[in-house]
Regions:
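Short, Lys/Arg-enriched N-terminal segments with co-localized hydrophobic residues
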Residues: 1-8
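Basic, polyanion-binding surface patches
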Residues: 8-161
Length: 161
C-alpha cells in the first residue's frame, strides 16, 4: 500500500475522489410540510447515540426539503433496498420532483414512509446547525421499523451496488 502518487488536482477534487472510496447506504429522507410531500435521496446518515436514540443527516441548503426542516418537524429516513435504485435516482433528480411519490409503496398518511424499505426511522428535528453549503440535522428517533431480510442499496465510486 503506497500513497506516493503525486496528485496535482485541487484539495477539493482530491477529497471528492477520496470520499468516492467510501461505501454508503442509500436512504430517502421524507417529510410532509403543510400537506406538501417532500423526499430527497441522502447518503449522509449517521447514528449519534442510543440514549437518546438520535441520528445526523446533512442536507444541502439548495435542496427543496431544506427550508421545511424546523425544530420539532417530523421526518422519516427510509433505508432503501437493492430494488429501489430507480426511486433513489428519481428522488435525487430535481427534474423528477413531481414523480417522487408515484411509487405504490409510499404511505403518505402522517409522516410519509416507504412500506417496502429496508428500514424506516421516524424522527423529530432536535437541532439544526449551519455549516457552509449544508445544514447538519439532528433527529431524535421516535420509532423505527426494519425488514427481516437484509438487502441494502449501497453506493460507491458513483455506482449502486
Amino acid at each position: 500500500f503506497s500513497l506516493s502518487i503525486i496528485h496535482t488536482m485541487s484539495i477539493q477534487d482530491n477529497f471528492r475522489l477520496a470520499m468516492r472510496r467510501y461505501i454508503y447506504s442509500v436512504s430517502i429522507m421524507s417529510s410532509k410540510d403543510d400537506g406538501y410531500l417532500n423526499a430527497i435521496t441522502v447518503s449522509s446518515v449517521t447514528s449519534i447515540s442510543m440514549d437518546p436514540p438520535s441520528l445526523l443527516i446533512c442536507i444541502n441548503k439548495s435542496a427543496r426539503i431544506h427550508d421545511t426542516l424546523k425544530i420539532g418537524s417530523e421526518f422519516c429516513i427510509n433505508l432503501l433496498n437493492k430494488d429501489q435504485e430507480e426511486l433513489s435516482n428519481i428522488c435525487s433528480d430535481e427534474d423528477s420532483y413531481d414523480e417522487r411519490f408515484k411509487d405504490k409503496n409510499w404511505n403518505t398518511k402522517g409522516v410519509p414512509f416507504l412500506a417496502n424499505a429496508q428500514a424506516n426511522i421516524f424522527c423529530k428535528v432536535d437541532k439544526l446547525s449551519s455549516y457552509h453549503t449544508h445544514t447538519i440535522v439532528v433527529g431524535l428517533v421516535q420509532d423505527a421499523n426494519y425488514s427481516d431480510e437484509i438487502s441494502t442499496l449501497t453506493y460507491v465510486d458513483g455506482n449502486y451496488k
